Amino acid sequence: MKRLYSATQNSIRGVIDGFKTEPAVRDEAVLVLVGLLLGLVIAPSGTWYAAMIGTLLIVLAVEFLNTGIEKLADHVTPEQHSEIRRIKDFGSAAVFCSLSLAGLVWLTALAVRCGLLG
């Protein structure tokens, strides 16, 4: 139980620090909040709603991971370095993939809601 409490404290600190220092984290948190409301209108069912919100939470989680990668890379060497740039680009690509997944799920839900898909 003590480990769970400690892990929760660490997570809360990470969320707070992310909100304070990272515009991308704030942007994607707003996306989740807007999605919570918009999803109620678009989602064809409760299952679709859960999937839609789940994909937005995945985007936010991947952004936190990407932020961690960038912070660590900057700590290792604040100078420009080709390998560090590649590592940061991989993290950015992961965010792009998660955003693409969210877009696909949301567009599919909208198509189902509009009767364009079964």
Name each region found by the language model.
Residues K2-G68, V76, Q80-S82, K88, ...:
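Hydrophobic alpha-helical transmembrane segments
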